[in-house]
Amino acid sequence: MAERLSEEQIAEFKEAFSLFDRDGDGCITTMELGTVMRSLGQNPTEAELQDMVGEVDADGSGTIDFPEFLSLMARKMRDSDSEEEIREAFRVFDKDGNGYISAAELRHVMTNLGEKLTDEEVDEMIKEADCNNDGQVNYEEFVRMMTEK
């Protein structure tokens, strides 16, 4: 995953890693991570810090080394990319830009994609995604629908 990062990104992450690695030993401890996160206005619990370290601690050392840090950053970047793609897709469906996808908007986009759907099929799609039963799909509902496995 880290192999998809540019040299420029890797250099930036090396700089950030050095900020985290307060004692310069080449590893970030949960304590160092906590210090930096608090300086950035975050207030993680000890358990949250351990989870973050554990998420990328491939060698089980209890700390994050630079390759593990790169892996974490690459994953975070990939996650934010897909978030932007979902937002973009929502805008395509939300023709009038009111923050909701109506049955008419869904039918219009699906027809343009070459999908001939009956009114019942469109209504069923809306009903499936519409958690609060207001007859349309808001952004949160759309994200949930798009990210469900």
Curated annotation (Swiss-Prot):
Modified residues (N6,N6,N6-trimethyllysine): 116
UniProt: Ca(2+) 1 binding residues: 21, 23, 25, 27, 32
GO molecular function, one term: calcium ion binding
Alphabetical UniProt keywords: Calcium, Metal-binding, Methylation, Repeat
Amino acids binding Ca(2+) 4: 130, 132, 134, 136, 141
Statement: the UniProt record of this protein carries the keyword Signal: no
UniProt-annotated binding residues for Ca(2+) 2: 57, 59, 61, 63, 68
Signal peptide span: none
CDD domains named among the record's database cross-references: EFh (cd00051)
Gene3D superfamilies in the cross-refs: EF-hand
GO cellular component, one term: cytoplasm
Family (UniProt): Belongs to the calmodulin family.
Miscellaneous field: This sequence differs from other calmodulin sequences by at least 13%. Many of the differences are non-conservative and some probably render the first and fourth potential calcium-binding regions nonfunctional. The authors' data suggest that there are at least two different calmodulin genes in the chicken genome, CCM1 and CCL1. Whereas CCL1 is thought to be the primary gene responsible for production of calmodulin, CCM1 codes for the sequence shown and is expressed only in cardiac and skeletal, not smooth, muscle.
Name the record gives this protein: Calmodulin, striated muscle
Gene field: CCM1
